[in-house]
Curated annotation (Swiss-Prot):
Record-level GO BP terms: calcium ion homeostasis; negative regulation of coagulation
UniProt record similarity statement: Belongs to the annexin family.
Encoding gene (name): ANXA5
Organism, scientific name: Gallus gallus (Chicken)
Entry GO MF terms: calcium channel activity; calcium ion binding; calcium-dependent phospholipid binding; phosphatidylserine binding
Position of the signal peptide: none
Protein's name in the database: Annexin A5
């Protein structure tokens, strides 16, 4: 596994799983619940340590920590604490399973995860999905989606993006021209061309293609996608382009729109804050401040409340004002 160092949550030291398990049991035993203790422990330990705490909790008390959290806590705060307890290994597979379960498909989750994860991460998600749920993720997704949106999801699921290496300028020029002809210069749009190029070329190659495209056409590739496509395909193509440019900037924007305007998309807020907390949340905070003229910390503070807010702010790990 790649070693990530840009997270806000790191291994806590000195760590004592038994002491943490005892403190959590005490916080939930008897009348009332000590939410403060729960949120302080769970947001300051990394995911591997949380699994050790759960194991110690089972050994000491014969109880399931997640079940106890579910019975003692409620609402968004409960969802956040339970998400923090989910083993990192299965986090994405679990989110995808729930995105394609029951009535209606949550295209937003499919888009966010499959556009932003590396090929190695996607391969891992597919394996975990099969192990945990005894089902083929690609089959499940194709059963719930259709059209060009489905085609691009399938391409991304193959995790066959070219590895980064020396960029061939002739191929950059060719791809930029082909994209221009497939969209702006054509009556209608050749979606397959966008899907193939954006779904399979290397990150460094595509960054050059986007620059070249701007030179040739006078448009940012995002403007063309916006004009030439619509619906779920448009959202997925845009997410892929944004992640090719910068994954932290993509997540900064995702977090911003989860809180902007009336109401909050708490599912997205929780999913991103938890899943990126040990990977690149420091970089996401930096991009957030740069692109939205306010800090992620301030926006969370303004948009949420109670123990839920306290826990999110601890995960955020600091203000960038």
């Amino acid at each position: 596994m790649a070693k990530y160092t840009r997270g806000t949550v790191t291994a806590f030291s000195p760590f004592d799983a038994r002491a943490d398990a005892e403190a959590l049991r005490k916080a939930m035993k008897g009348m009332g619940t000590d939410e403060e203790t729960i949120l302080k422990i769970l947001t300051s330990r990394n995911n591997a340590q949380r699994q050790e705490i759960a194991s110690a909790f089972k050994t000491l008390f014969g109880r399931d920590l997640v079940d106890d959290l579910k019975s003692e806590l409620t609402g968004k705060f409960e969802t956040l604490m339970v998400s923090l307890m989910r083993p990192a290994r299965i986090f994405d597979a679990h989110a995808l399973k729930h995105a394609i379960k029951g009535a209606g498909t949550n295209e937003k989750v499919l888009t966010e995860i499959l556009a932003s994860r590396t090929p190695a991460e996607v391969q891992n998600i597919k394996q975990v999905y099969m192990q945990e749920y005894e089902a083929n993720l690609e089959d499940k997704i194709t059963g719930e989606t259709s059209g060009h949106f489905q085609r691009l999801l399938v391409v991304l699921l193959q995790a066959n993006r070219d590895p980064d290496g020396r960029v061939d300028e002739a191929l950059v020029e060719k791809d930029a021209q082909v994209l221009f002809r497939a969209g702006e210069l054509k009556w209608g749009t050749d979606e397959e061309t966008f899907i193939t190029i954006l779904g399979t070329r290397s990150v460094s190659h595509l960054r050059r293609v986007f620059d070249k495209y701007m030179t040739i056409s006078g448009f940012q590739i995002e403007e063309t996608i916006d004009r030439e496509t619509s619906g779920d395909l448009e959202k997925l193509l845009l997410a892929v382009v944004k992640c090719i440019r910068s994954v932290p900037a993509y997540f900064a924007e995702t977090l911003y729109y989860s809180m902007k305007g009336a109401g909050t998309d708490d599912d997205t807020l929780i999913r991103v804050m938890v899943s990126r907390s040990e990977i690149d949340l420091l970089d996401i905070r930096h991009e957030f401040r740069k692109n939205f003229a306010k800090s992620l910390y301030q926006m969370i503070q303004k948009d949420t409340s109670g123990d839920y807010r306290k826990a999110l702010l601890l995960l955020c790990g600091g203000d960038d004002e």
